[in-house]
Swiss-Prot record:
Name by which UniProt lists this protein: Ribosome maturation factor RimP
Localization annotation: Cytoplasm
Keyword Cytoplasm set for record: yes
Biological function: Required for maturation of 30S ribosomal subunits.
The keyword Cytoplasm is assigned to this record: yes
UniProt-listed NCBIfam families: PRK14646.1
Signal peptide: none
InterPro entries: Ribosome_maturation_RimP, RimP_C_sf, RimP_N, RimP_N_sf
Family the entry assigns: Belongs to the RimP family.
Length: 155
């Protein structure tokens, strides 16, 4: 598929998405596959989570528009997905959902170096973040925290 047709396809899919309060945040066309694979990543314009139903409801009109456009004259597989969960914890909902999960906490040190602590998310308050590091609870003031991310627990 040439760049011009890819741009036309992207514009077509964005129109379908906009009509459903969605936006395209990723389009990957794998022409080296047989059949061609069209991967579309969507998100809601209002920031709400994407459900499986949202993906399914976008699939049919997207497929219909691709067929009507005649931009592809070969068989293809259409895959619709969401961005998934971000590794970085930012909202109150994230902290409640992932309590007990392994996290990396990036700290800003006084000497301008970054220190990373690894433990289980224990508690978040207005003033501090608490993580469980090998059975000991460490309270970290939020003014020292740069970033909190989900991870795999290290020994």
């Amino acid at each position: 598929m040439n760049k011009e047709n890819k741009s036309k396809l992207e514009a077509l899919l964005e129109k379908v998405a906009n009509e459903r309060d969605l936006e395209i945040c990723g389009l990957n066309i794998q022409t080296n596959q047989n059949p061609v694979v069209i991967e579309i990543t969507i998100r809601k314009t209002n920031g709400d989570d994407i459900s499986l139903d949202d993906c399914a409801l976008f699939n049919t009109p997207a497929s219909d528009e691709i067929e009507k456009s005649n931009l592809l004259n070969c068989s293809y597989v259409l895959e619709i997905s969401s961005q998934g969960v971000s590794d970085e914890l930012t909202s109150e909902r994230d902290f409640k959902t992932f309590k007990g999960f392994p996290v990396n906490v990036e700290l800003n040190q006084k000497n301008s170096k970054i220190k990373i602590l690894n433990g289980l998310l224990y508690e978040k308050s207005k003033d501090y973040l608490a993580i469980n590091i090998k059975g000991k609870i460490k309270k970290i003031p939020f003014d020292e925290v740069l970033k909190i991310s989900l991870c795999t627990l290290k020994d």
